[in-house]
């Protein structure tokens, strides 16, 4: 039972939480369900900070690390200091996806929150981290309580864009499925293949068109 949320989601106590995920939770999930080993972790606010810390301390546990409005300001920008310690390190083609709500939305601590996000974005833009792909997305019409809803949907559209194939394009060029999945595999450094059900449904649709 989680008895101390701040301990489990902030860097000082977060290590044991991710160790539990790696050693106990993930193996249990994989026994219960059919899973690919392409893994995504998503967090918001304080748990967004936890997702960022997972990238820093368990950078092979997941393939994509998603943080919606992460509390990078926590404990005097402690996460930013951890990033500074990792300058030059190889992140093995991991993807860091950060969304944040609009600058116009103000509340206590909001300016400090935006400043830390800008610092991290500047570090990634300079290429301080080897093989770390990053994407920062602002949602000006959202606030801290809603950004994760839009951000999660947009995440799927952006990260897996190659999977969204118009059937009219398939009719014109059946090879587009193979081409798109190969492009997705190159982008995310993981071998993706279309599911059997997708191929069967598409083949039945194509037969009806003929």
Q: What does each of the following model-derived ranges do?
A:
Residues 1-210:
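Non-catalytic cap/lid and distal C-terminal segments of serine-dependent acyl enzymes
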């Amino acid at each position: 039972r989680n008895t101390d949320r701040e301990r489990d989601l902030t860097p000082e106590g977060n290590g044991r939480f991710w160790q539990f995920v790696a050693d106990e939770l993930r193996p249990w999930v994989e026994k219960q369900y059919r899973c690919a080993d392409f893994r995504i972790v998503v967090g918001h606010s304080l748990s967004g900070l936890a997702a960022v810390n997972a990238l820093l301390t368990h950078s092979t546990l997941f393939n994509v690390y998603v943080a919606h409005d992460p509390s990078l300001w926590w404990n005097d920008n402690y996460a930013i200091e951890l990033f500074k310690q990792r300058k030059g390190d190889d992140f093995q083609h991991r993807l860091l996806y950060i969304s944040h709500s609009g600058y116009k939305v103000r509340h206590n601590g909001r300016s400090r929150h935006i400043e830390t996000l800008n610092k991290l974005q500047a570090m990634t833009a300079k290429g301080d981290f080897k093989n770390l792909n990053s994407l920062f997305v602002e949602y000006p019409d959202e606030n801290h309580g809603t950004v994760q809803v839009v951000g999660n949907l947009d995440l799927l559209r952006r990260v897996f864009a190659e999977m969204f194939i118009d059937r009219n394009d398939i009719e014109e060029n059946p090879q587009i499925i193979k081409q798109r999945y190969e492009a997705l595999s190159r982008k995310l450094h993981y071998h993706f293949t279309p599911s059997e059900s997708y191929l069967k449904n598409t083949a039945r649709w194509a037969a009806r068109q003929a």
